[in-house]
Amino acid sequence: MSRKCELTGVGVLYGNNVSHSQRKTRRRFEPNLRSVKFTSDITAGEYRLSVNARCISSVEKAGGFDAYILKADDNVLSGNARAIKKKIIQTKTAKSL
């Protein structure tokens, strides 16, 4: 499993630990990933995604999982999230007809 948020694309960053004497050693800054179950109101399904902690509050602020994923850019979404977005769009258009 990659250390990457499925909704925002936030991944591992690299930098230095810097001691008091200014010695630098390489380190990794890993995102605070959580496995979260999101419920879609449109498809009435539950989807488990690996997202970072900031993304959880962003989803709530956007008005729910459906609103967030419909506004999200396809370039930052994972393959799994893109498939969920496609399913939500298809269900939404089928209900509107």
Swiss-Prot record:
GO molecular function: structural constituent of ribosome
Regions that span the bilayer: none
Cellular component annotations (GO), alphabetically ordered: ribonucleoprotein complex; ribosome
Domain of life: Bacteria
GO terms for biological process, alphabetical: translation
Alphabetically ordered keywords of this record: Ribonucleoprotein, Ribosomal protein
Gene3D superfamilies, A to Z: Ribosomal protein L28/L24
Cross-referenced InterPro entries: Ribosomal_bL28 (IPR026569), Ribosomal_bL28/bL31-like_sf (IPR034704), Ribosomal_bL28_bact-type (IPR001383), Ribosomal_bL28_sf (IPR037147)
PANTHER family referenced in this protein's UniProt entry, alphabetically: 39S RIBOSOMAL PROTEIN L28, MITOCHONDRIAL (PTHR13528), LARGE RIBOSOMAL SUBUNIT PROTEIN BL28M (PTHR13528:SF2)
NCBIfam families: L28 (TIGR00009)
Family to which this protein belongs: Belongs to the bacterial ribosomal protein bL28 family.
Protein name per Swiss-Prot or TrEMBL: Large ribosomal subunit protein bL28
Species assigned in the record: Rickettsia rickettsii (strain Sheila Smith)
Phylogenetic classification of the source organism: Bacteria, Pseudomonadati, Pseudomonadota, Alphaproteobacteria, Rickettsiales
